[in-house]
Amino acid sequence: MAENRESRGTVEAELDPVEYTLRKRLPHRLPRRPNDIYVNMKTDFKAQLARCQKLLDGGARGQNACSEIYIHGLGLAINRAINIALQLQAGSFGSLQVAANTSTVELVDELEPETDSREPLTRIRNNSAIHIRVFRVTPK
């Protein structure tokens, strides 16, 4: 373990912020389904909550209601995704249940050199993710 830390520290020491510009690529997403919600920290919480509620209720006319939705959160947005799922469950009077899965997602960063004398680099890092299934329960 100590060997990994030392070698990683030397790589970090070579990456001077004056010499390289960090460009974070977008995370890889699976093909989007109509009932997938990707939560982020830029969009208003109430708007994201309303969008989830609208999918579950089927809009203003009650058409095309989804029996389940999947809420995805990455990194800092994990807490917001959990909060949205719990708010939906609390407002449903017991008709909705949640099931959560966690995972680790590999993210790729590009390091673009400021000068032509250096080559561009890529760096892979890991980030936590959560995938919450919110579904209707059939009354017994």
Curated annotation (Swiss-Prot):
GO terms for cellular component: cytoplasm; multimeric ribonuclease P complex; nucleolar ribonuclease P complex; nucleolus; nucleus; ribonuclease MRP complex. It comes from Bos taurus. This is Ribonuclease P protein subunit p20. Coiled coil: none annotated. It comes from the Eukaryota. It is found in: Nucleus, Nucleolus; Cytoplasm; Cytoplasmic granule. One of its GO terms (molecular function) is ribonuclease P RNA binding. One of its GO terms (biological process) is rRNA processing. InterPro entries: Alba-like_dom_sf, Pop7/Rpp20. Its main location: nucleus. Keywords: Cytoplasm, Nucleus, rRNA processing, tRNA processing.
